[in-house]
């Protein structure tokens, strides 16, 4: 079958003490570290938890990355996150529009930059990916070719690959590594493995 069924379970109940422990751990982060805030917030936690985390880290040299949607994403922009990663559908959803072309996606990515995001990484399904870096330079990467087996975790893999690639300081290489990592997960039964990532990099 070519159909894919995704089951999303309800998150655990997280109490106030666990949240307090989280913030104590945040104080152990050092300059140059990266923290990724991804997905939805459990219903037992305050809805502004992401905002509080970014406010807590404000003024420190820590890369804050947010992979979320709707108000969870929009409300953190005032804290100038280092990177946000909506897909093209989520980007359009923020502004109540449907985006199709690279130029449309770039235009709305720039709006997010104007609202505070330093770097905007947009996954565009079969169109590949677009990165608007903090120098306002737009980078576009095509999509890898292969047989889709599993799309679950592809966005997370792309983000992980991008951040790993960014250790070299080159946005273009980081975008390619992220694209290959996302593709490697999509074309496998599980998560991306290095050999498959390296193979797909040759396509980009």
Language model features by range: what are they?
Residues 1-34, 200-204:
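Conserved N-terminal subdomain of the carbohydrate kinase-like
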Residues 10-13, 70, 88-91, 143-147:
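Short, acidic/turn-prone active-site loops that include or flank metal/cofactor-
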Residues 56, 74, 102-204:
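Conserved phosphate-binding/catalytic region of the ribokinase-like
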Residues 22-25, 49, 53, 108:
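A general structural detector for well-ordered alpha-helical segments in enzyme core domains, enriched
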Residues 34-104:
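Conserved beta-alpha-beta core of the PfkB/ribokinase-like small-molecule kinase fold
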Residues 7-10, 37-38, 67, 123:
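Short beta-strand segments
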Residues 16-17, 93-99, 148-152:
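Short, charged, surface-exposed secondary-structure boundary motifs
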Residues 12-15, 41-45, 72-74, 128-129, ...:
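Short, small-residue-enriched loops and turns at beta-alpha junctions
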């Amino acid at each position: 079958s070519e159909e894919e069924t995704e089951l999303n379970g309800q998150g655990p109940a997280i109490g106030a003490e666990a949240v307090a422990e989280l913030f104590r751990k945040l104080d152990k982060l050092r300059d140059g570290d990266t923290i990724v805030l991804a997905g939805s917030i459990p219903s037992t936690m305050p809805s502004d938890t992401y905002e509080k985390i970014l406010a807590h880290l404000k003024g420190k040299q820590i890369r804050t990355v947010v992979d979320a949607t709707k108000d969870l994403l929009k409300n953190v922009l005032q804290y100038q996150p280092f990177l946000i990663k909506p897909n093209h559908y989520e980007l359009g959803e923020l502004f109540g529009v449907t985006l199709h072309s690279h130029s449309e996606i770039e235009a709305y990515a720039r709006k997010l930059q104007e609202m505070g995001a330093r770097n905007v990484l947009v996954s565009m399904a079969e169109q590949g990916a677009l990165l608007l870096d903090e120098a306002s330079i737009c980078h576009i990467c095509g999509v890898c070719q292969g047989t889709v087996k599993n799309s679950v975790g592809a966005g997370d893999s792309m983000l992980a690959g991008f951040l790993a690639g960014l250790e070299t300081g080159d946005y273009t290489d980081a975008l390619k590594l992220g694209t290959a990592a996302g593709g490697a997960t999509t074309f496998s039964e599980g998560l991306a493995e290095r050999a498959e990532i390296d193979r797909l990099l040759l396509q980009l």
